[in-house]
Amino acid sequence: MRVCIVGASGKLGQYMVEHALTRGYDVIGVCREQSVEKLARFADRISIVPGATNDSDVIRRAVAGCDGVLVVLAPWGVGTHYASGTAQAVLDHAEPGARLVFSCGWHISLDGQDVYPLRFRAKVKILAGVGRLARVVDLDDQVEATRRIFASDTRWTVVRGSDLEEGPSEGLPVWSRHIGDPVLASNRTRRVDFALFMVDALTNDALLHEAPAIVGCNTASALSYSTADNGRREPAAHIESPARMQSWDPYRW
């Protein structure tokens, strides 16, 4: 399988690169020119297309011939349409029938049936306000990006990550269609396993046109409430943790 990873230089992106290589996939990574050095340890095993992920021409070149596209849908910048521009470029240029898997947070809702805890809603509101004020984060643009994905006729999945932490793989996260399901109550997933779920979704047609909300398979809520429908698997092989990125990481991608 030939796979393009959009946003390959970030923490989540590097884990996805590692998982994809472990599966024997041919990997093309997209990242900003100034971030190419973060992929140095993969330089002899992947192809890199440097450039902004919301640059349509960059994405067109990167996804050509790819069977699957993994996208870190980050809401960076205000007024830049970074998330929606990235999503639109992928929707426009991915090969017909390609499997498209996008990452975002729990705050995205596919059908409006999610039930969010008060604390979560307050946190999102504060982070969204501070992010816009500092002109570094635009959650509204990420909402617009996912609206376009949901409305498209492509083979998409939008994976909604919980709060993330570093650490060895615990295995494939469990998932639910809606926030409020008790299986998600622990609100914690290893970042390496978020990446594992993204890569696994490429070949899991049960997730077509779904927006699974995930949680770590060894969390208390998952152990108490998981079923055969949202399944568990053994931990992945050891994956090296990416070098530490910026200290301020509000959405932990």
Feature names for model-found ranges:
Residues 3-23:
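N-terminal Rossmann NAD(P)H-binding glycine-rich loop of SDR-like oxidoreductase domains
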Residues 30-34, 52-53:
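N-terminal Rossmann-fold cofactor-binding loop
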Residues 47-66:
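Conserved Rossmann-fold cofactor-binding substructure of NAD(P)-dependent oxidoreductases
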Residues 69-109, 144:
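NAD(P)-cofactor binding segment of oxidoreductase domains
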Residues 82-83, 140-141, 185-199:
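Substrate-positioning beta->alpha
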Residues 110-114, 152, 166-175, 201-210:
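Glycine/proline-rich active-site loop of Rossmann-fold NAD(P)-dependent oxidoreductases
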Residues 146-167:
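Conserved beta-loop-beta element that borders a ligand/cofactor-binding pocket
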Residues 190-229:
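Alpha-helical substrate-binding/gating segment
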